[in-house]
A protein has these predicted regions:
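… and, occasionally, acidic/histidine-rich disordered N-termini of signaling adaptors
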Residues: 1-150, 163, 190, 198-220
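Short regulatory/linker helices and ligand/cofactor-binding micro-motifs at input modules
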Residues: 49-53, 173-179
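Short, charged, surface-exposed loops that flank catalytic or proteolytic processing sites
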Residues: 56-60, 178-187
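Divalent-cation-assisted or electrostatically stabilized phosphate/pyrophosphate-binding catalytic cores
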Residues: 145, 168, 172-177
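Conserved catalytic-loop aspartate of Hanks-type protein kinases
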Residues: 155
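Short acidic/polar inter-strand loop motif in beta-rich domains
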Residues: 159
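Exposed alpha-helical structural elements
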Residues: 171, 186-190
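Hydrophobic alpha-helical segments
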Residues: 179-182, 194, 198
Length: 220
């Protein structure tokens, strides 16, 4: 799961790990703020989320609910957005079920080998973390097939002072389509170059997951 990140002191993070049943979990998040306090809170939330997901084996919505409750129980004033995605094996042909939950974060995208781009959810999802621990969170499910790429990213990738987030997502989808077929590391690096156009205006994190094809397994 190659990933690229433009590193600054701030609150963006990503993570990837296996739950005990073998499902792969991919996370991206963004703590409000751009200082050492945000960086410290980011590390705390990252560890909490991983622990909750591993111990409980729960799906994305329940994991975010648990994290929200932990924030409330610790009486912190941390606010954050996050997407938790879980990839589960659907059959013996490499197809996977993708479940995800979104707490106020830019929506994930899926890139097909032919360049078609799907935006998962199309908006910023449910309420961000740290506001209301009783928030009920949606957990949509789709099927992803070998060769498709699941992309999670922080808002720093699509933000510009002279455009809206919707326009930024449209630019991202356009560049994804143009870069279809590249290896993951090259795709992430090219996206950063084309989207940021130099120095980023915000913290940026990006993670991409590509489902292996039969050819990938044969040559591995």
């Amino acid at each position: 799961m190659p990933a690229a990140e433009a590193a600054r002191v701030g609150g963006d993070w990503y993570d990837a790990f296996l739950q005990r049943d073998g499902a792969a979990v991919v996370v991206i998040g963004d703590v409000v703020g751009h200082d050492t306090a945000a960086a410290a809170a980011m590390g705390q939330l990252r560890s909490l989320l991983r622990g909750i997901a591993h111990y409980s084996g729960a799906g994305p919505a329940e994991v975010l609910h648990g994290l929200d409750q932990a924030i409330a129980d610790m009486h912190t004033d941390t606010l954050a957005t996050a997407v938790v995605a879980r990839l589960e094996r659907a059959d013996g042909n490499g197809w996977r079920r993708l479940r995800w939950a979104n707490a106020g974060h830019p929506p994930p995208m899926v890139l097909a080998p032919d360049g078609q781009v799907s935006v998962l959810g199309g908006d910023l999802g449910d309420l961000m973390l740290g506001v209301d621990p009783t928030t009920e969170r949606a957990e949509p499910v789709i099927t992803v097939v070998p060769g498709e790429i699941v992309l999670l990213y922080s808002d720093g990738l699509i933000e510009r002072r002279d455009s809206t987030l919707d326009e930024g997502m449209a630019r991202l989808a356009m560049h994804l389509k143009e870069l279809a077929g590249l290896p993951l590391e090259e795709l992430c690096d090219a996206l950063l170059q084309q989207m940021l156009l130099g120095t980023p205006q915000d913290d940026v994190a990006l993670v991409a997951v590509r489902l292996c094809t039969e050819r990938d397994r044969y040559h591995s």
